[in-house]
């Protein structure tokens, strides 16, 4: 048995199913490249058959990310598997991940199929996938609630057909650690050809035990792959948190005895990137990546840490990518200093043109803000990448003018482009942000409902840039938009337009759990 634990990240597929977490193609590529920098073993880039947008994103990631295995989900049918294979063709290394439900409840109520029909479909799906690759993963959906004898029969058959990874999914987060770990162990013991496949765990956090269940699957069950997401992103209560799995296995190597290929210094940058793109704020007390994860308020604890860090710290903040919030650049800093700091932060831009554009944004910010922090630099790059993506978007922010006097309703004028043609919307509102949104809607008329408006300061002080998240809903579809600017109202306009672009761009995608 291998002593390496494979990290399978599904932020771009299962994580995106969290309401409001839909991402553009460009955003998915940025996250995939960060996962590659982190040396994630397998990146599940999407569900190719769900939409043309997902297919394109998987295909582009497969062509650009070369150091990780790229994977696509596919239902257990020839059409889905063919679509996945077509999207993955440019990859250096790829995997097809096919699945079908095996629990009595799912077979009867969702699939309306008999166990024998499910057995045959699973077997034939893996056989068809073998035409494209030897790297095939099979998941019995809702496996933790499946009949043991039937589950063993199905898994033995798909391994015989060529499945090289068997993923035991706790789809609804029903498992508890001891039982789930023993489930994986029992399957490995009872299936005669189990040694021909790596067993994997995929847990959801409905009862708050996704990480505990996954670790039990590894320690008790002998699983050697964990499926997880950055920040535990996912629908309902989320998925297994990548950062918690990685640091638990690394910190307690004395207990787990497993090696990892992950560059842990890229964990916090990945967490911040996913949070910024999705608009899902990381709770301050979140393990590893929360703002308070390495903070000590107790006087006794502070004294101990000052004398010897290992008195109260079992991990070092710098080992997971935390850096001091220090002033690094100012308006007199040159292009080379800016480029060097980007490299130190692990931020890469694809071309000199992008670097020049980001540096121009930096100089503009430095004229308005005396102190530039690392977080500002990351926001600048994010803003530039978003602007490049918006070149092909339906709506593009241009400018904002506003007027507000005590006792009068604020007025706003927003200039933005619609497919390249500039329009100007003017309106009043209960406040400057309300007026700005109303001004945009005078030209757009989206009919979307505003579900969430939140503001977060990127750094400290009155000159801090504001990061605004806007969540919109229309026809049952929920999207997030994020905008940054030292002017909160301008950041709000950018966020609103970003959300509108997401509403406009992608038709509803198939959800594999409901397909």
Curated annotation (Swiss-Prot):
Summarize the protein's role.
Catalyzes the condensation of the acetyl group of acetyl-CoA with 3-methyl-2-oxobutanoate (2-ketoisovalerate) to form 3-carboxy-3-hydroxy-4-methylpentanoate (2-isopropylmalate).
Q: Name one GO molecular function term.
A: 2-isopropylmalate synthase activity
Q: Which family does it belong to?
A: Belongs to the alpha-IPM synthase/homocitrate synthase family. LeuA type 1 subfamily.
Question: So which cofactors does this thing need?
Answer: Mn(2+)
By its UniProt entry, which PROSITE patterns does this protein fall under? AIPM_HOMOCIT_SYNTH_1, AIPM_HOMOCIT_SYNTH_2, PYR_CT
Q: Check the record and name the CDD domains matching this protein.
A: DRE_TIM_IPMS
Task: List the GO cellular component terms.
Answer: cytosol
* Keyword Lyase recorded: no
* Organism name: Burkholderia pseudomallei (strain K96243)
Gene3D superfamilies associated with the record: 1.10.238.260, 3.30.160.270, Aldolase class I
Span list, region Regulatory domain: 396-515
Question: Which reaction equations make up its catalytic activity?
Answer: 3-methyl-2-oxobutanoate + acetyl-CoA + H2O = (2S)-2-isopropylmalate + CoA + H(+)
Q: According to its UniProt record, in which pathway does this protein act?
A: Amino-acid biosynthesis; L-leucine biosynthesis; L-leucine from 3-methyl-2-oxobutanoate: step 1/4
Major place of localization? cytoplasm
- List where in the cell it is found: Cytoplasm
Q: Which residues form the Pyruvate carboxyltransferase domain?
A: 5-268
Q: Which UniProt keywords apply?
A: Amino-acid biosynthesis, Branched-chain amino acid biosynthesis, Cytoplasm, Leucine biosynthesis, Manganese, Metal-binding, Transferase
The name this protein carries in UniProt is 2-isopropylmalate synthase
Enzyme nomenclature, EC number? 2.3.3.13
A Gene Ontology biological process annotation?
A: L-leucine biosynthetic process
